[in-house]
Amino acid sequence: MNEKRWRKEPGARVEGFRDLDRSKVQAPGIARDPSGGFRLFYTGVGPGRPFPTCQGYILSAVSDDGLSFRPEPGIRLAPQPGVPHMGLRTLSPTVAPCEEGCWRMYFESRGPASLPTVICSAISTDMLHWKHEDGIRLQGFDGLGGPRYVVLPDGRARLFCCAEERGSD
């Protein structure tokens, strides 16, 4: 059997030290930058959040080698308080190139606890400035989250997510 084994490398790739990410850094998703290197998108939480009830937003960092990352200033994607399903947090980004030469980010989103988590998307031409796309991409599952966009060997792609199945027991 041809088995691959993963080995954890020493050191953190991104550490929270700014007001935007001092409290939490989690759920990274990486994309190759067409101009070279890599851009890591991740969830951040800290005292510099965009509004008092915000529970998470998406930040980014760049790297030439995929090991040493430099955080970029600002928030890439923040919750939208006026949109019920996106009012409190945007988490767990995954980024994919589009045929039109732009980029699409899929992410977990949440409003108040009375609404379930959903998967939404945003679009960008430069991977720095993102525009929320209207609507919900995926919904209807308990505990939905953690989207990951994966290109298959034949060129098709799939969007994988986590979800809980709650039985009647």
Question: What residue ranges belong to the model's regions?
Answer:
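Beta-rich carbohydrate-recognition and catalytic domains
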Residues: 1-88, 92, 96-146, 150-169
